[in-house]
Regions:
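A short, glycine/small-residue-rich beta-strand->loop->alpha-helix junction that serves as a flexible
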Residues: 7-21, 44, 98-103
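A short, histidine- and acid-enriched strand-loop-helix "catalytic/donor-clamping" loop
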Residues: 98-102, 117-133, 147-148
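Conserved donor-binding/catalytic core segment of Leloir-type glycosyltransferases
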Residues: 192-208
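N-terminal strand-loop element at the rim of the active site
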Residues: 11-13, 25-87, 156, 161
Length: 208
């Protein structure tokens, strides 16, 4: 089967990009043909509070080749993205969704592609933890363009069904990230100069 993935992916950093790299890799391992369609601009600099949006030297990243075509704030690129994906002629288009900021581009692509292939949205977060007035209607706009959904938690499933009661979805647990290297024991870790033996690590559930 031929898959297209529309998502931030390498050289972007962050959980969504890494997840999409894992998804790409696993689909290829299963014998599928896969092509990644990436953002050429994810966030405008004025809206990005961090140091960089990109992988830096020393970061562990899954390096995936991609077509960098979608600009989140340039509507002209929405048409270019549709053309690029249509020329690839996928059987399935998977869209990574986690924030309503990207709905204008995503919804345009989904609407234009749904007559040509199955459009599946992989939802990392349907509604933000602190929603703004436009988050729900924008998410609904995108979801109504899709044939089906993948969710990875009960909370996201609940939000999806609330926003789009007729949604067809499957639910699978969020996989563990596997690109950080092999597990090592405590004593070996403590021999690392950057790790203090007396230090303690507090694990918290942030909902991310």
């Amino acid at each position: 089967m031929r898959f297209a993935i529309l998502s931030p992916i390498y050289p972007y950093r962050g959980g969504i990009a890494q997840f999409s790299g894992m998804l790409y890799t696993e689909l290829v391992k299963e014998g599928h043909e896969v092509k990644a369609f990436n953002f050429k601009r994810l966030y405008p600099d004025i809206l990005f509070p961090g140091k960089t949006q990109y992988v830096e030297a020393g970061d562990r990243a899954i390096e995936i080749e991609s077509v960098r075509v979608l600009d989140s704030v340039n509507p002209v690129s929405y048409f270019s993205t549709v053309n690029a994906i249509r020329s690839y002629a996928p059987d399935v288009l998977i869209i990574s969704y986690w924030m309503s900021f990207f709905v204008p581009g995503y919804a345009h692509v989904a609407n234009r592609m749904k007559k040509h292939c199955k459009v599946i949205t992989l939802i990392h977060n349907a509604i933000p933890h602190e929603p703004r007035f436009f988050d729900k209607p924008l998410a609904s706009l995108l979801f109504k363009q899709c044939h089906g959904f993948i969710v990875m938690s009960d909370n996201v499933r609940y939000d999806l069904r609330k926003l789009y009661p007729g949604a067809k979805y499957i639910q699978n647990p969020h996989p563990l990230y596997n690109h950080f290297g092999s597990k090592i024991n405590k004593n070996e870790a403590c021999r690392n100069p950057s790790v203090q033996k007396e230090s303690s690590i507090l694990w918290t559930d942030t909902g991310l």
